[in-house]
Design a protein with these regions (language model features):
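Long, basic/Gly/Ser/Thr-rich N-terminal segments
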Residues: 1-114
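Acidic glycine-/aspartate-rich tracts in secreted/extracellular proteins
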Residues: 63, 408-411
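P-loop NTPase motor catalytic core
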Residues: 2-36, 102-104, 108-400, 414-417
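Extended, charged alpha-helical "arm/stalk" segments used for dimerization and assembly
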Residues: 399-408
Length: 417
């Protein structure tokens, strides 16, 4: 039987001893595997991923200094001895072990309780990549976004999507903001490279950097989806709610007469990396946050940055899209039991939309691996409707989704992981 976070904290020293023994036994038989190409050699390497339609990477962050403080005893606990023991156990204990970086494998160490005492179940999970707590943002970006050629795909008229998924407090926003700023840094350089190749392919002379960069037109929108309500993060407003968050006009999310899902958002024409950086910073400053049990500044919403790319050299070509999504955190009942009514409803809607998203991702991966028709239920939720470009099986545009799944490092969260 799985244990609660409070009960896990009470027996933390026992779990730590079990975990140490597991690590010792495993190290004797199975060494930890790293990445196939060292980070220092990554940019010079010709190795590319198989470029599947759906690529999944795990990431776990290092624990913050206050790691254990979040799991001190429950003040409402009836057993005073249990609370006292929990409060004394302030040392961090990891619930995640990455055993292979590429292909990615990690073990979740799930606490349990039997008549004989505390137990740990070591459950393995596999993905394309796995990033441990010692891997920095630049390496994550290079091994995910760059290695999967997502920028080139979008510049070539396809759809590239990067999603940060995970439990509240697991580090999604930290990762996605770093990805957004690195995309802003690299996108225009990549556009000039692709533009030069296009000019040569059309029989033209070697184009200058300016001429190659002018081939593409970039328009940017930034949408926030909070529960069932969508708003425009680029809308300026001075009105705030009781929590100090800005109040914005509700945006409708629906298909138009020809089947496109294009909310009526402010679209900004961007010409340089600096302009894109400024826009990202402006939008992120408008995003709604609130304090939760797990995070003092938790992002309670899904945030979708969409960069539409028009090729002026080939005006009849499909418009490419780059969609960067920082998803709201998934929450267990234990994490949300202290929320007010509004936050409870938001958490419920967020969990439902994340479940719908998982169904769509699984169906898309299954469609790529098997022959025959596979239904992708993207109309089931506003979030998946906004991601129609990567889920619509009738679309002629190539698409690729990179999912960075964040796993909390705390053993108290292993059940959720």
């Amino acid at each position: 039987m799985a244990t609660s976070a409070t009960l896990t904290t009470t027996h933390l020293s026992t779990f730590r001893n079990i975990l140490d023994e597991w690590h010792q036994n495993r190290s004797k038989t199975t060494p930890t595997k790293g990445f196939l190409v060292p980070f220092e050699e990554l940019q010079q390497s010709s190795k590319k991923d198989a470029l599947k339609d759906v690529i999944v990477a795990f990431r776990t962050r290092p624990p913050p200094n206050e790691a254990a403080e979040k799991f001190h005893g429950d003040p409402d606990a009836q057993d005073a001895a249990e609370t006292e023991a929990a409060s004394a156990a302030v040392e961090f204990c990891s619930g995640i072990t990455v055993t292979s970086a590429e292909p990615g494998v990690f073990f979740a160490h799930v606490p349990g309780m039997k008549w004989s005492g505390p137990t740990l179940t070591h459950k393995p999970y596999e993905a394309d990549l796995a990033f441990g707590p010692d891997v920095g943002n630049e390496e994550v970006y290079q091994r995910t976004v760059v290695a999967s050629d997502i920028l080139s795909l979008a510049l070539s008229g396809g759809v590239g999507c990067i999603l940060a998924y995970g439990q509240t407090g697991s580090g999604k926003t930290y990762t996605m903001e770093s990805v957004e700023h690195r995309v802003a840094r690299d996108l225009f350089d990549q556009a000039r490279m692709v533009g030069k190749r296009l000019v040569l392919a059309q029989g033209g002379a070697q184009a200058s950097d300016t001429e190659a960069g002018d081939i593409f037109e970039f328009n940017v929108t930034f949408l926030e989806l909070l529960g069932k309500h969508a708003t425009d993060l680029l809308e300026s407003t001075e009105e705030v709610d009781a929590q100090g968050n800005p109040v914005r006009t509700a945006i409708a999310v629906r298909e138009d007469k020809v089947g496109n899902v294009r909310p009526n958002l402010i679209s900004s024409l961007i010409r340089t990396s600096e302009e894109l950086e400024e826009l990202i910073n402006k939008a992120l400053s408008h995003r709604r946050t609130s304090a939760t049990l797990r995070n003092a500044t938790s992002s309670r919403s899904h945030a979708l940055l969409t960069i539409s790319i028009k090729n002026k050299l080939l005006p009849y070509a499909d418009e490419g899209q780059l969609i960067l999504v920082d998803l709201a955190g998934s929450e267990r009942h234990e994490d949300s039991k202290d929320h007010d009514k509004q936050c409870m409803e938001e958490a419920r809607d967020n969990n439902k939309s994340l479940m719908n998203l998982k169904e769509c991702v699984r169906a898309k991966a299954k469609m790529a691996a098997e022959d025959g028709f596979v239904h992708i239920p993207w109309r089931s939720n506003k979030l998946t409707m906004l991601l129609k470009p990567i889920f619509d099986i009738e679309s002629r545009q190539p698409s690729r989704a990179m999912i960075i799944a964040h796993v909390s490092p705390h053993i108290q969260d292993s059940v959720h992981s």
